[in-house]
Curated annotation (Swiss-Prot):
The EC number(s) this enzyme carries: 2.4.99.28
Membrane topology: Single-pass membrane protein
One GO cellular component term noted in the UniProt record for this chain: peptidoglycan-based cell wall
Gene that this sequence comes from: mtgA
Taxonomic lineage: Bacteria, Pseudomonadati, Pseudomonadota, Alphaproteobacteria, Hyphomicrobiales
Superkingdom to which the source organism belongs: Bacteria
InterPro entries: Glyco_trans_51 (IPR001264), Lysozyme-like_dom_sf (IPR023346), PBP_transglycosylase (IPR036950), Pep_trsgly (IPR011812)
Enzyme class, UniProt record, top EC level: transferase
Organism for this UniProt entry: Rhizobium meliloti (strain 1021) (Ensifer meliloti)
Protein name: Biosynthetic peptidoglycan transglycosylase
Amino acid sequence: MPAGRWTATRRTWRSRRRRLVFIVLSVLILPYALIGLYLLEFIHPVSTLMLRDLVLLRGYDRQWVEFDDIAPVLVQSVMMSEDGQFCAHAGIDWAQMRGVVEDALDGEQTRGASTIPMQTVKNLFLWNGRSFVRKAMELPLAIAADFAWSKRRLMEIYLNVAEWGEGIYGIEAAARHHFGVSAAKLSRRQAALLAVSLPNPIDRTAGKPGRGLRRLAAVIERRAGRSGGYITCLYD
């Protein structure tokens, strides 16, 4: 290959490599910039699943609702079901995480350790499915979100982007779809059913619960009724 042509080829590869590095860095940095942007309470974030539905021309149902317009029994139920230490940790429940790692090293089936901040950043910026790459991105993002946002703002965003059925996002759309009421009017049992459906909202239908889901909801309803000491960061 002539020297001039070889030099041109090298320049082309360097240019492509620089572009690739720029794209990768942009993808990694963008979520942190958005975390800062979402400090502004008039901005209503959307999740990656909502964006997917838009790209696929499916559409979705999401009606943003402010934290104070969500029934406290729903907040209590979600905390007791998904992240009982939400007010105590700084984005990651390290005790739970350590237990998961120990179970994995022992070859045992691992239990969930995703906190509400972790689930929120996953919904906003990442993708579903188990992946070490996703988890490595999720952990620092959860810490950043918990540091930047108030606990009330974090919970508000989480409850407005969580999936509660095919094309159903956010607690207002979920409450109206499954029970025909607003998020402010949910009963204790309805709130518990919505909370326990969160891990698998496609297969677990809050509005038409099976026996197993009703049993889980009864447990969460009892825990929510005793959750006063766990929710001090959200209610005065």
